[in-house]
UniProtKB/Swiss-Prot annotation:
Protein name per its UniProtKB record: Putative myristoylated protein 006R
Source organism, top-level taxon: Viruses
Keyword Ribonucleoprotein: no
Family the entry assigns: Belongs to the IIV-6 118L/458R family.
Subcellular locations according to the entry: Membrane
Lineage: Viruses, Varidnaviria, Bamfordvirae, Nucleocytoviricota, Megaviricetes
């Protein structure tokens, strides 16, 4: 499987960042001001995003672009895009071969979302201050090309890969998947195959090199026959396993599948693993749908009791890929729950929240699911704040001049759609002043459902070491036979 986790999430994050950057350009007026997000030289007339006559270079101010990329609405779109794409990645990894698959999925999605929050910091320090991109132009009009997305992929690709490579969660998941795949592998490793070939062919090869072709006359043809035998065994014997794909829309709902049901719908299998084992033990079963939840168009899940399983004895050759590449609408993120109280939080259940404010100290905490603990993030207090005379509160409404409060009081504003930042306001004599810097908020939090719909497909896994060994034996046998023939004396060739 190699580095498929890192490669897939890098590709998704880079493309999402590139699309967002391109969208920002499409909504930005082009000017000659080099401090703007995008600027062009020699602009005649009004500048609008239209026309497509000839190509001109435009300068991208990366600092201005990064500032635009960290706005709440852009960050929310990036988060939702990556969370949606993460479902396809998860589905392709056959995650249900791992114990605690739900936790692994949740960790993966969480790391993917956090990647959005860190990319801007990583890329800001690693990309150049300015970049030139191609645009198309008609007289005084300028049109941003479709290939700006591709150009931004080139710009952001390296720094996104670095951000992914340094993320321990992605690397840990990859190690678990690799370990699981290795533990199920049947046969020799490639190094063992190489050693076996060396042992089998070592003597005749040495004999040819030494000028003695007698052994080679027999051993190399035998090598060809042995290689052919390995290929026959490789093609005729296979280990049958199940490939499970999460967040499925089901075989029955995928037009490309053309599935034929194998008997009635069952309501006796409690989970997808049981369905997979049942299909695996049935020679007529080639695929299954296991439904444990009903997912509506908004991505809300409602548990289906009892779960339903449908087995199939026939599906199309493209069915598995069609199901894997088109996951359902399950939402994997949600708005966090905010709570406040006097004193530090004690547990997840007390209070039942994701973010907590201690009104006695202005300390704020995020709940960390992997450790099941509250983690202090910082404090909102300014130097003059005192618990004895001042108060603190938070919410989704920006304070105004008419908002009541005692001088020194604190109000923390966070976005109602995506609380990715905390804006700290302090009451003065006649207004509320915004303090800097802006603090990092929780953003959207992961919400992987406990029950996930799954489709599984029977897969025949062949012993690849037999293929490697067979090909190696045939190649060495052919070349060895030629070598042995050429080493014979002229009178022996007749």
């Amino acid at each position: 499987m190699g580095s498929s986790v890192s490669k897939n999430i890098s590709k998704v994050a880079t493309e999402a960042l590139a699309r967002a950057s391109s969208d920002i350009l499409l909504q930005t007026d082009l000017t000659t001001d080099q401090t703007q997000v995008i600027s062009v030289s020699d602009v005649g007339g009004d500048v609008v995003i239209s026309g497509n006559e000839f190509i001109q270079k435009a300068t991208i101010n990366m600092k201005a672009l990064m500032n635009a990329l960290i706005q709440e609405n852009v960050q929310q779109n990036l988060t939702l895009q990556i969370a949606q794409a993460a479902k396809s990645i998860v589905s392709g990894f056959n995650m249900f071969q791992l114990p605690n698959a739900q936790n692994e999925i949740d960790l993966f999605v969480r790391a993917s979302i956090e990647l959005v929050n860190t990319i801007s910091q990583v890329c800001t320090s690693s990309v150049s201050e300015n970049y030139l991109i191609d645009i198309k132009r008609v007289k005084g009009s300028v049109r941003i090309q479709n290939n700006t997305v591709r150009q931004f992929v080139d710009i952001f690709g390296s720094c996104v890969q670095n951000a992914v490579a340094s993320n321990a969660i992605f690397q840990d998941l990859q190690a678990k998947l690799d370990q699981s795949a290795t533990s199920k592998a049947d046969g020799l490793t490639l190094w063992q195959v190489a050693a076996l070939v060396a042992i089998v062919l070592g003597v005749p090869v040495v004999s040819v090199i030494g000028g003695i072709a007698v052994a080679g006359r027999w051993m190399f043809p035998i090598s060809i026959l042995a290689g052919a035998g390995c290929l026959v065994v490789w093609s005729s014997q296979a280990n049958t396993t199940m490939a499970d794909h999460a967040f499925s829309r089901f075989v029955r709902n995928t037009s490309d599948c053309l599935g034929t049901a194998l008997g009635p719908v069952l309501q006796t299998l409690p989970n997808s693993n049981a369905a997979a084992q049942s299909c695996l033990s049935n020679a007529d079963c080639v695929a299954f749908d296991w439904q444990g939840t009903v997912v509506d168009d908004k991505g809300t899940n409602k548990v289906l009791t009892p779960p339903q399983t449908t087995f199939y004895n026939k599906v199309s050759s493209i069915c598995e890929q069609a199901v894997k590449s088109n996951p359902d609408t399950t939402r994997l993120v949600r708005l966090p729950i905010f709570a406040k109280g006097v004193g530090s939080p004690q547990s997840k259940a007390s209070p039942p929240a994701d973010v907590y404010l201690d009104t006695a100290t202005t300390n704020y905490y995020f709940f960390d699911p992997p450790t099941n603990m509250w983690v202090k993030q910082g404090t909102f207090a300014h130097a003059e704040w005192s618990a004895a005379k001042n108060q603190i509160d938070w919410g989704t409404i920006t304070p105004t001049v008419s908002t009541p409060g005692t001088p020194g009081n604190i109000y923390v504003y966070y976005g109602s759609d995506n609380p990715i930042y905390f804006y700290v306001y302090v009451k003065t004599a006649d207004s509320w002043s915004l303090y800097t810097p802006t603090l990092r908020g929780p953003g959207l939090v992961t919400d992987t459902p406990a029950t996930i719909n799954v489709s599984g497909f029977k897969v025949n896994q062949r012993r690849q070491w037999l293929l490697y060994l067979g090909v190696a034996l045939i190649i060495v046998g052919i070349f060895g036979s030629i070598l042995a023939f050429n080493s014979r004396r002229p009178e022996e060739r007749k």
